[in-house]
């Protein structure tokens, strides 16, 4: 039982962490105009959306 429980937690972390990272990356890309890091590199893509 402990091994299956550990495998479940491990797989949950393995899937959950990259998912949270991708969601955060998507949100930061959507708000790229406000962020100084994305304002220069993403201006061509996010400019017309203004």
From Swiss-Prot:
By its UniProt entry, which InterPro entries does this protein fall under? Answer: PSII_PsbM (IPR007826), PSII_PsbM_sf (IPR037269)
Which NCBIfam families would you find in this protein's record? PRK14094.1 (NF010694), PS_II_psbM (TIGR03038)
Instruction: Please list the disulfide bridges.
Output: none
User: Mostly located where?
Assistant: membrane
Question: HAMAP family per the record?
Answer: PSII_PsbM
Q: Where are the transmembrane segments?
A: 7-27
Q: Which GO terms describe its biological process?
A: photosynthesis, light reaction
> What organism is the protein native to?
Prochlorococcus marinus (strain MIT 9515)
Q: What does the UniProt keyword field contain?
A: Membrane, Photosynthesis, Photosystem II, Reaction center, Thylakoid, Transmembrane, Transmembrane helix
Quote the subunit structure annotation: PSII is composed of 1 copy each of membrane proteins PsbA, PsbB, PsbC, PsbD, PsbE, PsbF, PsbH, PsbI, PsbJ, PsbK, PsbL, PsbM, PsbT, PsbX, PsbY, Psb30/Ycf12, peripheral proteins PsbO, CyanoQ (PsbQ), PsbU, PsbV and a large number of cofactors. It forms dimeric complexes.
Q: Could you tell me the superkingdom of the organism this chain comes from? A: Bacteria
Gene Ontology cellular component terms for the protein in this record: photosystem II; plasma membrane-derived thylakoid membrane
Question: Where found in the cell?
Answer: Cellular thylakoid membrane
Q: Does the keyword Protein biosynthesis apply?
A: no
Protein name (Swiss-Prot/TrEMBL): Photosystem II reaction center protein M
Membrane-topology annotation of the record = Single-pass membrane protein
Role, per record: One of the components of the core complex of photosystem II (PSII). PSII is a light-driven water:plastoquinone oxidoreductase that uses light energy to abstract electrons from H(2)O, generating O(2) and a proton gradient subsequently used for ATP formation. It consists of a core antenna complex that captures photons, and an electron transfer chain that converts photonic excitation into a charge separation. This subunit is found at the monomer-monomer interface.
Q: Would the keyword Thylakoid be found if you checked this record's keyword annotation?
A: yes
Family, per the entry? Answer: Belongs to the PsbM family.
């Amino acid at each position: 039982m402990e091994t299956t429980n550990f495998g479940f937690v491990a797989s949950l972390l393995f899937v959950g962490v990259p998912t949270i990272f991708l969601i955060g990356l998507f949100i930061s890309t959507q708000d790229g105009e406000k962020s100084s890091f994305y304002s220069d590199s993403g201006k061509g893509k996010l400019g017309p959306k203004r």
